[in-house]
Amino acid sequence: YGGGVIPRFSEVASQFPLSSEFHTLRVQPPPGMHYNTDVLRKMCDIWEEHGSGLIAFHGQSGDIMFQGATTAKVQDAFDAINELGFDLGGAGPAVRTSMSCVGAARCEQSCYDEARAHRQVLNTFVDDIHRPALPYKFKFKFSGCPNDCMNSIQRADMAVIGTWRDNIRTDEALAKKWFAKHGMNELVNDVVSRCPTKAIQIKEIGKLRHDANIS
């Protein structure tokens, strides 16, 4: 199983026989964490039949954690999960399971197709996920914008973050309406000074420059 099964054997099995084996199957989530209720019910049925019934959505690497299987039931559980279209994730010194935000499917902040990038990258490295052969773990995470909902900066070795590459888009009528209500102090303190790249400046109308590359 490579890195996808975390074996756990108890040192007190002679005293507590039911604790003798409690293995975990790490299963890769779909890009964007999209599930329908039919799939979730089937997952629950599989784990009730072959495991303890305890499932964690999701581990810190993004895996669905099917916790509590015996050695004899690991293969049966994997086969049933695999029939649903899911594959084991990674553990140890390998390429780990990845995560991507809901992104282009539902979020207006999305700057690229996160689900497509997630799938293509992970499919490319699937052999390195299943067969640990690296000196240390390696994680990809995909966030569609600098809000970084996947915490890729903190949690990944390769953070893929969508950014805006164009002029700032403004609604002049809305901006004037907002300014009339909030005034100069809020404009400076809550808008201009909060731009990390200092892309916004306040100019007198007579000193404005007009150019195709200036919003």
Residue map of PLM features:
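N-terminal basic/disordered segments at the start of proteins
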Residues: 1-39
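Small-residue-enriched alpha-helical segments and adjacent helix-cap loops
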Residues: 23-185, 194, 198, 207-214
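Cys2His2 zinc-finger metal-binding sites
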Residues: 188
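Short, non-ligating residues that shape and space the ligands of small metal-coordination modules
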Residues: 201-202
